[in-house]
A protein has these predicted regions:
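P-loop NTP-binding core
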Residues: 1-357
Length: 357
């Protein structure tokens, strides 16, 4: 993969509540602060990323009588699905997100697109590969001129193994798994190892049939090969021991993080064993446990970030929300936490830049 090629990364865990949206948004913002041009794709019908970034503007981009497709991802996908003229691509920018970050906003209509996808008639026959690789086509249109390509595309996904997740993974170069400090995360990491090889095998079956019928068409040759790039530990707590100068992760979260690391090790072994046709895990991985970085529990900072449509790193530049009618001031501890989280996201961005090449 050439260094100037757009890197497409899905942020995925089939478990909910692991901060996929927050990580997608803030990692994209951190990559932009490193000078990278970033496209975020909200591919979750719940539209949390779009609402977080756009705030009060989000309802205005949804379909209306006058504009039946709106200016969300629906404008592209529905025209494609119904073969209705040229596909239209719209991008948006958040109120306070770095201006090198663009967003393709979500729409609840994504549920309709998901229902239109059939593994049997579209994928396994090879007749509907375009439907399952539509994200790749969307990115190609978003990139436009060769000189103006995105460095990174981050895709926010729903917490399931549904067809939307398949579609995103088939067009992704890498995927990153956010995890939280609970026993279910370790279990769900294992499920990825059981499910992803089947997804890849079914894509390969469809491609083989497509290539048999279209021997000179290599359109899909580089798709369907997502590589596990690592995991992010999110939401743990720290304490400062009396005899120590710095905070340490609390024992319970440390133990849980270790269990997740064990689950990730098994995931890597499973992927390498069951996917032989291409590399399935990062060869130039950041650590033995594929650990990309940690994000301490953000507590009320997350609520303020969502209410103010502001990435964590910029919260110290605006007043916090005490309630919907009153503004307060950040406490010294909160300002320290914002600074630390900013550093954490930049560190993860640096590892992504170094290893996802």
């Amino acid at each position: 993969m050439s260094s100037n090629k757009t890197k497409v990364i899905s942020i995925f865990n089939n478990k909910g509540g692991v901060a996929k949206t927050i990580i997608t948004w803030n990692l994209g913002d951190a990559l932009a602060r490193r000078g990278k041009k970033v496209l975020l794709i909200d591919f979750d019908p719940q539209s949390n990323l779009s609402i977080a970034m756009l705030g009060d503007r989000f309802p205005d981009i949804l379909p209306t009588v006058e504009n039946p497709y709106g200016t969300t991802i629906r404008a592209f996908l529905q025209r494609f699905l119904q073969n209705q003229g040229p596909l239209q691509f719209y991008k948006h920018q958040g109120y306070r997100t770095n201006n090198k970050v663009d967003l393709i906003a979500s729409d609840p209509w994504l549920n309709v697109y998901s229902e239109s996808l059939s593994v049997g008639s579209d994928l396994l026959t090879g007749n509907g590969l375009e439907k399952y690789s539509i994200i790749n086509r969307l990115i190609q249109q978003a990139n436009g001129n060769e000189e103006d390509k995105y460095d990174y595309v981050l895709i926010d996904l729903p917490p399931s193994f549904n067809n939307l997740v398949r579609t995103a993974l088939y067009s992704s170069n890498y995927f990153i798994v956010p995890c939280t400090s609970d026993i279910f995360c370790s279990y769900c990491v294992g499920l990825i190892g059981e499910t992803l090889p089947r997804f890849i095998k079914e894509w390969e079956i469809g491609c083989q049939l497509h290539d048999t019928n279209n021997p000179h068409n290599e359109k899909y040759i580089n798709l369907g090969k997502p590589v596990f790039a690592g995991w992010i530990f999110n939401g743990y707590d720290t304490r400062k021991p009396k005899d120590k100068a710095s905070k340490k992760i609390i024992a319970a979260d440390y133990v849980m993080g270790s269990k997740i690391a064990e689950g990730v090790k098994k995931l890597v072994e499973t992927l390498e064993k069951r996917i032989k046709e291409h590399p399935s895990v990062l060869q130039n991985h950041p650590s033995e446990s594929f650990f990309l970085g940690g994000i301490e529990d953000m507590n009320i900072l997350v609520q303020n970030s969502m209410w103010l449509n502001c990435p964590i790193a910029r919260l110290d530049q605006i007043e916090p929300v005490k309630n919907f009618e009153d503004r307060g001031q950040w406490s010294p501890n909160q300002l320290d936490q914002i600074k630390k989280l900013k550093t954490n996201f930049l560190s993860i961005a640096d590892r992504v830049i170094k290893h996802c090449i």
